[in-house]
């Protein structure tokens, strides 16, 4: 199974979750041939570079049932779709300013039977809803992201981790994180996933 790498790090998946993860390979290959949401050279690394990378967020927080999460700039559905599979009792809204990409996310979510995932063609500035967490993957510098999504963070807490932004990023982030140095937390993904690709990849958490 292509999704064996997911099972390696998340051994407690249900049969439904395993099936949903397995279906992603064919679905993303088919859609990527029509609408480019993953670079052509990277599609063979879908599970490691996109699905497992998205699930790194689950290594720093187990979202409680009923948690509302906004995936800002989801592209073709990352990190939102893998997280929605892993946390079926949470609600995910996936937004992106590019309609073609959101169509892919919607079609994939429909095909695997995700009921807790709402993709919408929308710019972040226009999102009015309230969420416990905003997640993103290499969308924009953290200070810019925070300016846009601060309005969307709910004041009501229901998780062990205070509400805020969780962002997947790579490389040297010192300058980007400096404005938040007193409260931001950076975790190396290589702490959890041993594949070479995850070196210099980080989970950035900022309570808001």
Each language-model region and where it sits:
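Active-site capping/gating segments
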Residues: 170-208
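Non-DNA-binding regulatory cores of transcription-related proteins
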Residues: 120-122, 149, 168, 174
């Amino acid at each position: 199974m292509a999704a064996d790498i997911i099972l390696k790090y998340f051994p407690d998946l249900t049969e439904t979750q395993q099936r949903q993860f397995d279906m992603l390979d064919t679905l993303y290959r088919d859609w990527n041939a029509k609408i480019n949401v993953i670079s052509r050279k990277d599609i063979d690394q879908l599970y490691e570079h996109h699905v497992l990378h998205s699930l790194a967020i689950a290594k720093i927080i187990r979202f409680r049932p009923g948690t509302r999460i906004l995936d800002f700039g989801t592209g073709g559905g990352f990190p939102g779709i893998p997280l929605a599979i892993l946390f079926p009792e949470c609600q995910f809204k996936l937004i992106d300013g590019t309609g073609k990409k959101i169509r892919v996310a919607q079609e994939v979510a429909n095909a695997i039977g995700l009921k807790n995932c709402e993709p919408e063609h929308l710019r972040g500035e226009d999102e009015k809803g309230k969420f416990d967490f905003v997640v993103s993957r290499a969308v924009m510098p953290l200070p810019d992201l925070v300016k846009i999504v601060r309005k969307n963070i709910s004041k009501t807490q229901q998780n062990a981790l205070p509400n805020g932004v969780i962002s997947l990023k790579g490389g040297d982030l010192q300058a980007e994180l400096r404005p938040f140095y007193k409260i931001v937390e950076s975790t190396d993904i290589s702490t959890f996933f041993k594949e070479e690709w995850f070196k210099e990849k980080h989970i950035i958490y900022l309570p808001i």
